[in-house]
Amino acid sequence: VILHGILGSGANWARFSRDLALLHPTWGVMAVDLRLHGRSSSGSPPDRLESCVEDVLALASQLGYRVEAAIGHSFGSKIALQLGTSVESIRHVISIDADPGPVDLTGIDREQVPVLRLIDGIRRIQKTGFSTRREFDQFLESSGFGEAVAGWVGKNLVRSDGRWQFQLDIDRVEAMLLDQHHFDAWPLVQSSSCERISFCIGGKSKVVSEASRNRLEDLQVQQPGRIRVEIFEGAGHWVHIDAADDLLQFVSERMLD
């Protein structure tokens, strides 16, 4: 199962999922839309990581799937870690450019945090929407976001009454994000309840702090085989876009380990 980041969707991972399935035809690959995202329903509050875990398990049960690996990008990584340390059938967890520790934003202006700035921008224009997709792209550009973010967030736009609009409960989405910020996944990483945990980090990304990188590398030495840290030097936060082939090769080989 592949779990996207906040304000993303399973469609962000469509190419990667297809390529992984082509490499391993006997594997089933499921790139989900998390609650409040993409084509998924809103689900019932509370909007916490635990609720997302329950949603994924309910979907897998409904489809009759046995989940054996969880891949999570950014926000999705802590869901993947919770799945991997609570579901016996899951042998592999792969965290993509996400810090396992809590994120402390105390005293930091929201404008200085890109994802919060993006949420605030969507909140401002949510009622009016956009006449064209190009207008949406220009809005993001004026807010300091590039083409990659437009492609990622734009998967949540729907056509309604002649305009492109976000059908998002942005306050609930932010509640999910803040719960993820508060959650400390280090105890899950250091436990022995998941057989293999890998951390794929964009070399140009600042999401995983230097202290966390050092801690992960120490764990890799202490628990060889179980913990693996892989730095994708040319990649930023969107490793699956910036280093698509290298990430695909790593995931493919690691899950055969």
Give the predicted meaning of each segment.
Residues 2-5, 31:
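Structural cue for short, hydrophobic secondary-structure segments
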Residues 5-11, 74:
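Active-site glycine-rich loops that stabilize anionic/oxyanionic intermediates
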Residues 14, 21-71, 75, 106, ...:
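Active-site loop/oxyanion-hole signature of alpha/beta-hydrolase fold enzymes
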Residues 81-85, 89-130:
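Flexible "cap/lid" loop of the alpha/beta hydrolase fold
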Residues 127-179:
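Conserved alpha/beta-hydrolase catalytic His-Asp/Glu region
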Residues 161-224, 228-231:
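Conserved serine/cysteine hydrolase catalytic core
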Residues 232-248:
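Catalytic histidine-centered segment of alpha/beta-hydrolase-like enzymes
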